[in-house]
Amino acid sequence: FVKTGTILPFREISPSQIYTFSEDFKLTGQHFTVQDTDGNTLYTVDGTAPLVKLRVLDNYDREVFTMTKQLGHALATYKFYQDGELYGTLEKQFDLVRDRFTMEVTEGTLELREYSGTVGHNYKVTLNGEMLGAIMDDMDLTVENAVFDNAYLIVYRPDKLPLLVCMAVMAARELARDKEGAVTNHTISR
């Protein structure tokens, strides 16, 4: 208003949904559950140990999303499949400050970028600059959070929840890899 003298319309705010993302211990590999705010399990996630393949299953045990880690790449690379079809290839980008991954999909460019939060590791997921959601560490001081990867997913487009679930597991695995001393953007910048 100050610059133009014209009242600008408010941007419509899209409501978001919050989901919990909790790891369960399994000797056979990674296992996660995704629940809504009422505690209803929406998806289960099963992955191999070490994480090479990850499957997101709905309540009917149908595979709705799959992620596979591509071995032999200098920077982390993952292939994502939706309903058995290739959705895109997520590649870690060289960035001196924060983790950043991009993927070209039919809808445009998808980006997962670490952003500064007060505590913990937080990521935002955008598609062509539009916010799809965020992945935030569960910072409650519990034994489960100290041992397992637990997070909150804030989702603006519920149809993208399985994609965000895969990205949350991938981000958690990359953080664990960073802690184990792998060469990463963070170690290069020090």
Regions found by a protein language model. Give the residues of each.
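Low-complexity or membrane-interfacial segments used for flexible interactions
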Residues: F1-K53, N59-R62, E85, K92-R190
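Hydrophobic/aromatic-rich structural module bridging two neighboring secondary-structure elements via a short loop
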Residues: V56-T89
